[in-house]
């Protein structure tokens, strides 16, 4: 049979094909008939109609003509609904524009692009109520008071009121919420900062005889000390530390970089680069030398990694990091870097030993430690690099271990010894806030946070604040405090996880915190050398995040920068004044053929090491330093915060206290033991011929001065005025003996070859070598401002009432009468 001749059968289905038909059919199967289905459906519709009628009838009654209140309420509701839902399109457009400008800010490569996008976003964003975030009325009243005082024109009133009431956080104007998402500082705060800066410049630039230079400088020092300092803190984070480059670069470009910079781990690398370079060198480094930041070496094969871990206990070899740091910082010490740039560098390290506390290395606590050694120790994270020994410069400039080696087991008597080693400071003190507060009077911190275990938590905290409001932000802060509290409890109880608890028990944030928005790709390469593209990406992230904080930084640091500018200008004027006085004195002495009137400016405290290292000078050091300061100030903007260059070379360059001669040490002991009566100090007249002791005055010399006077009394009559000189030389082996005369003190320099020989008299008068005895004050930092003010007071008394006499020189010695009004024990 042929298959093609078979009849085709169409497909068929049982039951209705539509959904409604199937539903009815299904319902009929469970009902007795269609009439029963219609009755059930009618009852269901009637039930819901009655319920709807009972619900709607009260609202319908409002439309009755005899119920005007109901009609008014209904019209109000309808108007509100129309207003609410007719603006949906407009609000959607505004949200789209805000999103667009935010994306522009996230991808901006220059500050101009970012500022334009931020300005447009600020227009699209509803304005906040600023009076809820700070005391606007207090700032306005203070601004009016300052303007009224300036219009009166009394500089002393301005100085008096500003010295009494000048604080950083006036009316909570440093509130971080106030500056969040803002391009500019709020108007009233900006006007207040500008007014204070204007009045500070008025005091600084005043030429009236009402205020002396010393008085203005003292006022600026005291006000700055009371106002406080700002420090920049850079956290750890391995290769994520390239984020700090963008932060520092932005602060440098806007001239907001603080003078105090501290960090740990990779943050210490960026701090070392910044603290060892001038402004032009910093800008050149950011533009051309980013590729030199190679933190890690090549891991190599599996066997080399296993061998390194078994022998050194570390994954990477630290020699690559040491070579990079040597190229970046040379062999500079903390003191030399401070003398060269004026910036204070702080690096934190901690010890593997259980009972040794962490340290913050700086030019005060460890002046001669080599910077590259401190940075490598601060980067030695356990398992990544082995712990390192600190290196320092000795008296001859050689690189030696900072700590002497000690016996590992003295009870057994073994001869093996090892030096003290240090490791990553972020393990215990990632942000050394407490140390900087104690040493440098810091009360405001700018923190760049890139730690992989902290940055995500801070980003989450910002998201909670942005989407949850203030109450949610307070809850997030409460959770943070609870975590830190539990970690501190773990540390107190001494549980085995104490090392992990230390990471979370530290301070994470500062007054202004810049948090890195790291991606998963960046976290995956955290212990690898970043490529040039990755470095640029991280640096751009740092720049954009810092641009968002510029408003807060300008508001918090504006007055501080104005104080720094004024102090820098006044210090420059004082250096010029002293140079002119020395030049005029030298010219007058050479013209009249008389000995110069050299002064020794002794204060009521022992001078610091940086000031007293002068005995081996040839007399031209002051002039060289003054010329260098003039050239340096002419080549850069005086408005930066680090123009306070020192007046003397550091002790590491001129020999320092470790290279003092025996005679210089004797002279220092003599200055410390002087005990001059206050009547004698005030009794000196301005004329060189006036008597040393006023009528009715008393003088009580110290036992050391009495002994010195009795020793040299036989030789004092043979000393006469010698040839014209401006200074004397004290060399190794010479003896410096004091003597009180009728018009001051005589300092007899007895030559080494004449010790033990009788006085010959005035046979061969030689011309002594030229060296200056006056010691210009090295500009003090904020930790010694009060002592510096005492020096300034002594200088003023010296100018007003001291008597200056001439210098004489002979074979047996040379006399230097010194004003008694400036030597006070």
UniProtKB/Swiss-Prot annotation:
Involved in the release of fatty acids from the oil body in germinating seedlings. Can hydrolyze triacylglycerols and diacylglycerols but not monoacylglycerols, phospholipids, galactolipids or cholesterol esters. SDP1 lipase activity is required to limit triacylglycerol accumulation in roots, leaves and stems, which are vegetative tissues. Functions synergistically with PDAT1 in regulating fatty acid flow from membrane lipid synthesis toward peroxisomal beta-oxidation through a transient triacylglycerol pool. Inhibited by diethyl-p-nitrophenyl phosphate, diisopropyl fluorophosphate and [E]-6-[bromoethylene]-3-[1-naphthalenyl]-2H-tetrahydropyran-2-one. PROSITE patterns: PNPLA (PS51635). SUPFAM superfamilies: FabD/lysophospholipase-like. The active site is at 265 (nucleophile), 424 (proton acceptor). It catalyses: a triacylglycerol + H2O = a diacylglycerol + a fatty acid + H(+); 1,2,3-tri-(9Z-octadecenoyl)-glycerol + H2O = di-(9Z)-octadecenoylglycerol + (9Z)-octadecenoate + H(+). Its main location: other. This is Triacylglycerol lipase SDP1. GO terms for biological process: glycerol metabolic process; triglyceride catabolic process; triglyceride metabolic process. Signal peptide: none annotated. It is a peripheral membrane protein. A motif (GXSXG) lies at residues 263-267. It is found in: Lipid droplet; Membrane; Peroxisome. Disruption phenotype: Not impaired in germination, but much slower rate of postgerminative growth. The keyword Hydrolase applies. Transcript levels do not correlate positively with enzyme activity, suggesting a post-transcriptional regulation. Glycans are attached at residues 129, 327, 331, 601, 616, 637, 800. GO terms for molecular function: triacylglycerol lipase activity.
